[in-house]
Amino acid sequence: MRTLCIGDIHGNYKALVEVLERSKFDMKKDRLISLGDIYDGHSKGPECVDLLMKIKNFVWVLGNHDEYVRRWFTGDWKKFPDGEARWLRKGGSITRDAYHKNGKLNKKLVKKHAEFIKQAVLYFIDEKNRLYVHAGIDWKYAVDKQPSEKNYYTGRDTWRVDATKL
């Protein structure tokens, strides 16, 4: 099984399809790890998610834009007091509008995607002990003991690589 990573799709369905085609991605055999931000930016976020749902070995690492959409799906903005307004300013209005058809919210699609996004993880460690995360972590803490889950999708710490392990 090959493992391929993709990050920051931002609703660009055409680019997602092109990357999968050019890499000769096998939807049944290969693993795709999304490093987050499937949503916001382009208007085809729902189409991207529909395609990703067809991949047998798909890992969704949560990005900050995915977290915004997840909160929009649930209406839970407690941890983000200005979250919805901020999300709408940062590309969320495009995603929100993409879930509407003829001016009405497509509740069936929202429900389906809200269920699928529940599988998203804050980070992923594969069988070779490689860490996959959207943004970063605070290196003073263990990967699974971060002081805030926001570190995983908004952290800006510099990555460390141990070249002796490569």
Feature annotation, model-predicted:
Residues 86-166:
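Acidic, His/Gly-enriched loop-helix segments that form or flank divalent-metal centers
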